[in-house]
């Protein structure tokens, strides 16, 4: 089974037949695997290439510069630079800590008064902040467009999910997986351990190194590689909040980053990826939505919990 690759120009096309085909293929991919690939989307190739260049530029800064933007030792605010091993996603998936071999940088919306962003000095990497704030905005626009496609695929108005995400709390994360020996990745150490994402949908940009795998939802415990064909492709995956809203019609899939398949010896190259974690407004409920219940179907997620409360409950396990 492979992750389906969809042409986004079909959704932007004025011909209703092409739009309908796109939304139905998107729903089929997300309901079957939890993942899809989007090509020919609105974010230009030149911007994505700059994105990877800025990401590499940040992670190659001297340690003392990155420490100026250090993530606090506690889970919140989920902002700034995290060193290797600071975040332990394996605690969520397995109930035990296994070192995740990555460093990361997290940011949210520029107008977030509750959790303001944490930046290194402008002089350390001039232009970095301005580029990332612009890129964040591009991702938020695409996030809402894709939610409109998902709404339409489920026979809801295109704008159905928009009010649930009106107070933006989404996060952009830059990831760097340092070069590591093949031996280290065959002895239980993951580049990033198996986990699901917390929010609505995630937009993932990855380089050509590979190693991303997604669990086959029809065969728990079996993982399949997500090919790193083109860094301009966007990998879209379902998050926990969308799973809860849809009463498991769309399910968040476990995924991890490990040894690229086919590599038999030597070193695994540095890997860079960027993830935009689309999220609901913090005060929005993550109970199952009544509009998404089929006839005679009971809601699986009935407890009253806001998106912020759910996000915090997950974050507390990772730091």
Swiss-Prot record:
Q: Could you say which cofactors this protein requires?
A: Fe(2+)
Q: How is the cofactor bound?
A: Binds 1 Fe(2+) ion per subunit.
Annotated ranges, domain Fe2OG dioxygenase: 168-280
InterPro entries given in the database record: DIOX_N (IPR026992), IPNS-like_FE2OG_OXY (IPR044861), IPNS-like_sf (IPR027443), Iron_ascorbate_oxido_reductase (IPR050231), Oxoglu/Fe-dep_dioxygenase_dom (IPR005123)
Q: Which GO BP annotation is one of this protein's?
A: small molecule biosynthetic process
Provide the E.C. number(s) assigned to this enzyme. Answer: 1.14.11.-
Gene Ontology molecular-function annotations: dioxygenase activity; metal ion binding
* Residues noted as binding Fe cation in the record, renumbered to the chain: 195, 197, 255
* Metabolic or biological pathway: Mycotoxin biosynthesis
Q: Which UniProt keywords apply?
A: Antibiotic biosynthesis, Dioxygenase, Iron, Metal-binding, Oxidoreductase
Task: List the coiled-coil residues.
Answer: none
**Family, per entry:** Belongs to the iron/ascorbate-dependent oxidoreductase family.
Q: What is this protein called?
A: Proline hydroxylase buaE
Organism, per UniProt?
Answer: Petromyces alliaceus
The beginning of the lineage is:
Eukaryota, Fungi, Dikarya, Ascomycota, Pezizomycotina
